[in-house]
Amino acid sequence: MLEPVFVDTGYVLALVNEHEQHHAQAVLLAQRYDRHPVVATDAVLLEIGNALSRLARPAAAQIMADFRESVGSTVVHLTPELFDAAFARYQGHADKTWGLVDCVSFVVMRRMGFRTLLAFDQHFVQAGFVLARP
């Protein structure tokens, strides 16, 4: 079985939007990691839904349904304990511009042992993770 890969919002947005600056790289990453199981949080799915609600609502709905229904994907749900851990990280790094959803991802990735992810956000690098390369 292939190693699971964590998915960030920015990767999905770049994959869907051909005008996004990272689109070509996202397509290459999608090809490379096509058969890998994927992991995201429901907070990431909320960001995807919000970001695509006006321009690509059907695509957003399909992406979220695929994440929720596919046997090859795992959605980690936001619990009160997970929120508290992410919020503590958010508060504890006032010198960073990390978003709260990114902090949720950081906590989940550390707990699940992820080092590499599908993303273009340098905040993950600041937090000690590695962005996947095509």
Roles of regions detected by a PLM:
Residues 2-4, 106, 111-134:
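Acidic, PIN/NYN-like endoribonuclease modules and their adjacent C-terminal/linker elements
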Residues 1-40, 53-64:
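Short, well-structured N-terminal submotif of metal-dependent ribonuclease cores
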Residues 8, 102, 121:
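Acidic active-site catalytic centers that drive phospho-/nucleotidyl reactions
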Residues 12, 45, 124-125:
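A generic structural signal for short hydrophobic patches within well-formed alpha-helices
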Residues 3, 74-115:
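Active-site neighborhoods of divalent-metal-dependent phosphate/nucleic-acid chemistry enzymes
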Residues 37-39, 71-74:
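Short loop->beta-strand "edge-of-pocket" segments that line small-molecule binding or catalytic clefts
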